[in-house]
């Protein structure tokens, strides 16, 4: 997709919910893996993660976030014209999780509700999708719920989270600028190869097998990630994409208050920051405490690190998500007068 601009769309607010359960990468592992985990934490920067209870779905976290946001905004339920759910952890393969949440949230039947399957890069795509509905004139107020449930005790990277963001029509609102991209030739770099129609789940896919001599165990139904390919993709694609969007918007790096990137790992994120020449204080991070929360990582970081600053005055924020697909999206948005309630634990 070419770069694009949305006008008359206001960023009204955001809420984020994470599980109460905290998993430590250093202590919640087998004793024989302790030394390896210590080295890993130094490289990826993830010390603790949030993991949902067995009964919790992504939709439960997103529901709590949406409830808190609607309360903070004092929006009436009947005013919500659109509900978009962006996740790779739906409640069911069918129906759409958005339909279920439309009912749980008490939204009217006139609310258009649908799901989008996207992970790490999800947030800029989600803002563009909802913003486009609003800019087209058919939607006045809408919610987009983004997040996933991908954490496990044995995986040191991923965390669970659900987020809600509200956009509304506002004549004369500062423009939102976007640049969204996809490269499906790299789809195998991050993939769940089993569970779809290409490879239905069989009994053999559920059996754990030893991956290497370090006592790592894996199942065919688990996420497969090519770390080298992801590192190369992220560090090569993201910096030029940021420069491209800034040039398109006629903005300089000095004019941007915060640069919020998908929280992949320390090595990737630090390489991107240094390539762009950005000061640490302009690049908030939640990797240490929350790990990689997939599509929710941008809202998690905004809520957990800079929500008070975002509420206090007008801020120009550049948001960049990248990963599964492969895909990457960048958004430049001015935020003023928006609601950012504190992080919810559920």
Please name every model-derived segment.
Residues 135-162:
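Flexible, glycine-rich active-site loops centered on histidine and acidic residues
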Residues 59, 63-66, 89-90, 108-110, ...:
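Claisen-condensing/thiolase-fold acyl-transfer catalytic domains that form or cleave C-C bonds
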Residues 28-35, 60, 89-100, 264-267:
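A structural motif shared across PLP-dependent enzymes of the aminotransferase-like
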Residues 65-81, 240-257, 305-310:
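Phosphate/pyrophosphate-binding loops at sites that engage ATP/ADP/AMP, CoA/4′-phosphopantetheine
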Residues 46-48, 79-84, 103-116, 151, ...:
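Glycine/charged-rich beta-loop-alpha catalytic/anionic-binding loops adjacent to active sites
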Residues 12-15, 86, 117, 142-148, ...:
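Short beta-strand segments
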Residues 1-55, 155-232, 236, 240, ...:
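Condensing-enzyme catalytic core mediating Claisen C-C bond formation in acyl metabolism
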